[in-house]
Structure formats: structure tokens, C-alpha cells
């Protein structure tokens, strides 16, 4: 099953989730191997270029202005510092540099301040990605014109669970921005977070929403929630390791040609869990000790992991084999 489908039913997706674990991983790995080199992983790096004071009320987020998490508000980074961080990421093996700003929806003035950052990173020979919040169609076209490669806009969870995690926007708002980005021919990076109080049906529904987009996301980041003290979700029950690995596997089956990225939460994953995620179809990670406001394994730790697992870093453009 390597054909890209956009008509998955919820019943079909739930059936995948309930397969015996070994059967599910075998099916996912077989599809992964047909579309990618199973021993290659793409490396991205993520930088928070504007921290905190977000007006949204996402119950899990340290950057929301609604909660006292001890996070200090920081204004937009100067371009020289951004490019210095990008060069360091490139020297460490990253092929894509992602820049995130804690905005609900950026103003045109804010977009204009980010444009030189995008152009500077592109001039270094890296792929560019930004996550800036909800976009208008006009803003998406502007970002395309300046050469942006990827736009990240996660749907977070299922449509059914969405109002339980945020009230300042709705699920359709997320889809509208993804549509604007795809209309501008910018490649989409969109995934979700596990550990938001969702059940297996919610995970199935979330993946169904992603796979039934007009074009599958080029990248599907899947995050394991890192509970933040001071947020309403600071004591929420995390998913089990097998639940997370199952979600990776189902994502690979449903979106066979998308890059599936292990994102936040890897500090809680040992070698075995990460190895099973790679076997199930994950083929990208975020590199560097910080992901926005949460910790991430250091580069030496990841390099050691790659050596132990026999994994090679590859340029993003050379990752896909079919």
C-alpha cells in the first residue's frame, strides 16, 4: 500500500490502530522501506525567534500569556543572532532550519521582519521553515515569493478534542491556514501532539484529517507532550510507549511518502523506543538541545544513538527514494 489516499474513513483508521502490534509494525515498516531508505534520517533544527506572550489559551503551552509558567517574554530576535544559530545548526548536520514565533496571527509588519531571516537562511544553502500562527492567503503568497520552503502549522489533536485544549481558535482555523499555504505552493509541515487527553479514536481522527488534505503534508511532526508546570495540563496522564509507536506506524501507512518527524518529548524516550519509532516509519528528528521552550537531546547524544542504530544523516532533498 504505497498509493497516496485522501479518502480514509475513521473506521478504516481505527482498524489499523487495533491491529496486533507486530502486524502493525510489519505493515508500516514494509511501506516505509518501499518509499525511503530505512536507515536514513533527516535532521531539522528549530529556533524560537519570538518567545512568550501568546494570546492563545492552549492548555499545554508554556508560551500562553494566560498561565504563569515562569517563561520570560522576549521580543523578536535580531537577524544576526538568528543566522548565527542557523550556521551552528548547519555545522551540526541540520539541513532544514525552522523558525517559530509565538503569534496568534502575524501582522504584515511582522511578516516583513521575518523575511530577511528566511532569505539569510536560504543563502546558507539550508531549507527554510517558519511557524508563525494563522496566515491570510495574501501572507502565504508573500512567503512563497521570498522563497520559503515549508510552513509548519500543527492541527494538534482531533477535531472532536480540539475545544478541550484551546478556546481562542477552532479546528477549522487550522485547516484554513493549511489550505492557504498549499494554495501558495508552500510545502506543509503539520502534525500533532500526543498526551492532550485524547483517546485512540482522537488519534485516528487527527491522522485522518491530515491524510485527507488535498495534498499530504510533506512533513508530519508527532510530539509527545512535555507537561509544563503552571499550565492546566501539567499533571496530565501521558500516552504509553506502545500508543505513541502505534501512532507513528499508522501515520506511515496513511501517508506513505511523507516524512514523519519525531519531535518534542524525545528526552523521555530511550534507545529502544526511538528505534521502534524509526522502524515504524519515523525518519526525521529535531536536532539541538532546545525545542522552542522544551528540552531536547543534545547533538552528541543523538550522534551516539545514530551510531548504535546504524543510522545515517541525509540531506532532506535526497531522503526520499521514490
UniProtKB/Swiss-Prot annotation:
Chain coiled-coil ranges: none
Single GO MF annotation: 2 iron, 2 sulfur cluster binding
UniProt xrefs under Pfam families: BATS, Radical_SAM
Biochemical pathway: Cofactor biosynthesis; biotin biosynthesis; biotin from 7,8-diaminononanoate: step 2/2
Keywords linked to the UniProt accession: 2Fe-2S, 4Fe-4S, Biotin biosynthesis, Iron, Iron-sulfur, Metal-binding, S-adenosyl-L-methionine, Transferase
Keyword Secreted on entry: no
Positions that bind [2Fe-2S] cluster: 98, 129, 189, 261
EC number: 2.8.1.6
Protein's UniProt keywords contain Metal-binding: yes
PROSITE patterns cross-referenced by the UniProt entry: RADICAL_SAM (PS51918)
Binding site for [4Fe-4S] cluster: 54, 58, 61
Matching Gene3D superfamilies: Aldolase class I
BP terms from Gene Ontology: biotin biosynthetic process
Cofactors required: [4Fe-4S] cluster; [2Fe-2S] cluster
Bound cofactor: record note: Binds 1 [4Fe-4S] cluster. The cluster is coordinated with 3 cysteines and an exchangeable S-adenosyl-L-methionine. Binds 1 [2Fe-2S] cluster. The cluster is coordinated with 3 cysteines and 1 arginine.
PANTHER family membership: BIOTIN SYNTHASE (PTHR22976), BIOTIN SYNTHASE, MITOCHONDRIAL (PTHR22976:SF2)
UniProt family annotation: Belongs to the radical SAM superfamily. Biotin synthase family.
The protein's role, per its UniProt record: Catalyzes the conversion of dethiobiotin (DTB) to biotin by the insertion of a sulfur atom into dethiobiotin via a radical-based mechanism.
Record-linked HAMAP family: BioB
Descriptive protein name: Biotin synthase
Gene that encodes it: bioB
Amino acid at each position: 500500500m504505497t498509493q497516496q489516499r485522501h479518502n480514509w474513513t475513521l473506521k478504516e483508521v481505527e482498524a489499523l490502530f487495533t491491529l496486533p502490534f507486530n502486524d502493525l509494525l510489519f505493515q508500516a515498516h514494509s511501506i516505509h522501506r518501499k518509499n525511503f531508505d530505512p536507515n536514513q534520517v533527516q535532521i531539522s533544527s528549530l529556533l524560537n525567534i519570538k518567545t512568550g506572550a501568546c494570546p492563545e489559551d492552549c492548555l499545554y503551552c508554556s508560551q500562553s500569556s494566560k498561565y504563569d509558567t515562569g517563561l520570560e517574554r522576549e521580543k523578536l530576535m535580531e537577524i544576526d543572532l538568528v543566522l548565527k544559530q542557523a550556521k551552528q545548526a548547519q555545522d551540526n548536520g541540520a539541513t532544514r532550519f525552522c523558525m517559530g514565533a509565538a503569534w496568534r496571527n502575524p501582522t504584515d509588519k511582522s511578516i516583513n521582519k521575518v523575511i530577511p531571516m528566511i532569505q539569510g537562511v536560504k543563502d546558507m544553502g539550508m531549507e527554510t521553515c517558519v511557524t508563525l500562527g494563522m496566515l491570510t492567503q495574501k501572507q502565504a503568497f508573500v512567503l512563497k515569493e521570498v522563497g520559503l520552503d515549508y510552513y509548519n502549522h500543527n492541527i494538534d489533536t482531533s477535531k472532536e478534542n480540539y475545544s478541550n485544549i484551546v478556546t481562542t481558535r477552532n479546528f477549522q482555523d487550522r485547516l484554513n491556514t493549511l489550505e492557504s499555504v498549499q494554495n501558495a505552493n508552500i510545502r506543509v509541515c503539520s502534525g500533532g501532539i500526543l498526551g492532550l487527553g485524547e483517546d485512540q479514536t482522537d488519534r485516528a481522527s487527527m491522522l485522518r484529517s491530515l491524510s485527507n488534505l488535498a495534498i499530504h503534508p510533506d512533513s508530519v511532526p508527532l510530539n509527545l507532550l512535555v507537561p509544563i508546570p503552571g499550565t492546566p495540563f501539567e499533571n496530565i496522564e501521558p500516552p504509553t510507549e506502545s500508543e505513541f509507536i502505534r501512532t507513528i506506524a499508522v501515520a506511515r501507512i496513511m501517508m506513505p511518502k511523507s516524512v514523519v518527524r519525531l519531535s518534542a518529548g524525545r528526552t523521555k524516550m530511550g534507545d529502544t523506543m526511538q528505534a521502534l519509532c524509526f522502524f515504524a516509519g519515523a525518519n526525521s528528528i529535531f536536532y539541538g538541545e532546545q525545542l522552542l521552550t522544551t528540552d531536547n537531546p543534545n547533538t552528541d547524544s543523538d550522534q551516539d544513538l545514530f551510531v548504535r542504530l546504524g543510522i545515517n544523516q541525509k540531506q532532506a532533498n535526497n531522503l526520499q527514494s521514490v
